[in-house]
C-alpha cells in the first residue's frame, strides 16, 4: 500500500513538470517560428 501512495503522489508531480516543459518548448517554437500551422507555400 505504501508503493501505491508513493506512485499517486509522484505521478501528478511528474506530469505537471512534463507539461510545463512541453508548454515552454511550444511557446519558444512559436516565438522563433510564428504561424507554423499555416502552410505558406500552398
Swiss-Prot record:
Gene3D superfamilies: Single helix bin. Keywords: Chloroplast, Membrane, Photosynthesis, Photosystem I, Plastid, Thylakoid, Transmembrane, Transmembrane helix. InterPro entries: PSI_PsaJ, PSI_PsaJ_sf. Its main location: plastid. One of its GO terms (cellular component) is photosystem I. The chain crosses the membrane at residues 7-27. It is found in: Plastid, Chloroplast thylakoid membrane. It comes from the Eukaryota. Belongs to the PsaJ family. HAMAP family: PSI_PsaJ. May help in the organization of the PsaE and PsaF subunits. This is Photosystem I reaction center subunit IX. It comes from Zygnema circumcarinatum. The lineage of its organism: Eukaryota, Viridiplantae, Streptophyta, Zygnematophyceae, Zygnematophycidae.
Amino acid at each position: 500500500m505504501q508503493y501505491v501512495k508513493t506512485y499517486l503522489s509522484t505521478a501528478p508531480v511528474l506530469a505537471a513538470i512534463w507539461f510545463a516543459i512541453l508548454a515552454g518548448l511550444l511557446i519558444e517554437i512559436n516565438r522563433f517560428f510564428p504561424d507554423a500551422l499555416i502552410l505558406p507555400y500552398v
